From Swiss-Prot:
Interacts with host coagulation factor XII (F12) (inactive and activated) (via fibronectin type II domain). Interacts with host high molecular weight kininogen (KNG1) (via amino acids 421-466 and 459-513). Anticoagulant protein. Inhibits activation of host plasma kallikrein-kinin system by interfering with reciprocal activation between coagulation factor XII (F12) and prekallikrein (KLKB1) without affecting their amidolytic activities. Glycans are attached at N57. Keywords: Blood coagulation cascade inhibiting toxin, Disulfide bond, Glycoprotein, Hemostasis impairing toxin, Protease inhibitor, Secreted, Serine protease inhibitor, Signal, Toxin. Salivary gland. Coiled coil: none annotated. This is Haemaphysalin. Residues 90-145 form the BPTI/Kunitz inhibitor domain. The keyword Signal applies.
Length: 162
């Protein structure tokens, strides 16, 4: 979650302001808040739920889900992981271990961009470490680091829009 702050600039051509966001570490108590998806529009009936992140204590992973309660969720997968699972391999620096001869494509998770990116590295012996941010395949990286998504169910239409 980011807290907005307004900065005012005085220039030769006039005055203007802009809103900037300061990153803050969420309250660890949010890691225990049950994930409950919105089942339609928010309380006033007009606002759509926001797609935010919650922490699943069983899987030890973050989940993206629609919610009307912004204060009870994390703004990003990165903040969710940093708050609830600091030891996640998805937050670790990429593996730099022992190399063999040859080059291979591996994948690293970029928590700021919330995506798995390919990297060319010298080939490792057999597999990558289960504690480091380096994966043998994009699928393995996504399964480990990308948040799962809980769909919103539209009761009136009987559909899952998104």
């Amino acid at each position: 979650m980011h807290l907005p702050a307004t900065i005012v600039f005085f220039t030769c051509t006039g005055v203007f302001s802009t809103t900037v966001f300061a990153k803050y570490r969420a309250n660890p108590a949010l890691c225990k808040v049950p994930i409950k998806s919105a089942t339609g529009n928010c309380r006033n009936g007009n606002d759509l739920p926001s797609w935010l992140y919650g922490y699943n204590n069983i899987t030890k992973k973050c989940v993206q889900y629609p919610t009307c309660f912004k204060r009870l969720a994390f703004e990003s997968n990165e903040i969710c992981l940093e708050t609830c699972n600091k030891q996640s391999r998805c937050l670790q620096p990429p593996e730099t271990g022992i190399f063999d001869i040859g080059w291979s494509t591996y994948y690293v998770y970029n928590s700021r961009k919330n995506m798995c990116k390919p990297v060319k590295k010298m080939k490792f012996r057999k597999t990558t470490s289960k504690q480091k941010n380096l994966f043998n395949s994009e699928e393995e990286c996504q399964q480990e680091c990308m948040p799962s998504t809980t769909p919103i169910y539209n009761v009136a239409q009987g559909t899952y829009p998104r």
